[in-house]
């Protein structure tokens, strides 16, 4: 492993005096410090994941900044600063000459979905910024922070290139609507990138002006989520969209220095979602009825783990919550145990031919950190057998760096 100088702590002192580092949304800063020390010592426990992270960050250094104004489609507003995407499962109606209005085929992606660049460019920007920010924080190499800052300025800050802070035209459906509340699932990746934004605070490349500008964008966006009809419509959804909505509101509020908003969302809104989503058997019927029941149910529960992490930062123990039928998140996680520990076959044949293990990996990390750290290796072996997905490498996953399980 190449030797690297660890500079972020010194930079934070020089730039911010003795002020305490800003609160992270989903990551434990003490864990990051432990991982950073392990990286410095070339600890074999973190080396595969760290090397993979640096490799991705190096590739991100070569990436051209993406600007939403370069999208090939023009939103109904006529303003290419507006985000626009299409519902992935909507197809032309073969019984209609013009195919309109489109009809839904759950789980089947229409290739037209990929022709609208907004979503893909947002995801690429967020993923690159995550890799670059984490790499900077763990190595102290300013080149990573500098590139992350460049990508963020182009996508969110520069008036000439930035995205407008709304999703008015998210997940449109030809012949039906130009945008929907559930389009806000597209920005779940943005909520997951908040910690990467916060970690850049100690960098010389990310200025106070940059931070203020990005906070202003995020604040405007999440206020739009709370107050616009499209945003409120998403907030009324019962399923994974509600989980993603709450997670985003909480993460954005924390980034904007408004933890009381996150606290209010958790206590006054999120808790009630448990009554809707989790029946007495601790399953997730709203997700399990989908054509990709494994993917949707584990994705939704992973969103809840993000809410658990945020609750931890705010001193709110979501694990202790029980809904009106007495079900807790602990029981919802344990609903999967017969499958991942005992090899019980999945109850239905999904449209997807693979069971992605990434979501259940993070779920079990958060669960084991709370209840049984020593059992995590057992869960990993069970997940490997049940999902049978060789493309996912547990050893190189960034979760090893962000959510380490020490048992």
Task: Report residues per predicted region.
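Bacterial N-terminal signal peptides that target proteins for export
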Residues: 1-7
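Bacterial N-terminal signal peptides
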Residues: 8-17
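Exposed boundary/loop context
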Residues: 9-10, 71, 288
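Extracellular glycan-targeting catalytic surfaces
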Residues: 18-234, 267, 279, 310-313, ...
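Short, contiguous, pocket-lining structural segments
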Residues: 181, 185, 189, 210-217, ...
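Long, repeat-rich segments with strong aromatic
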Residues: 244-347
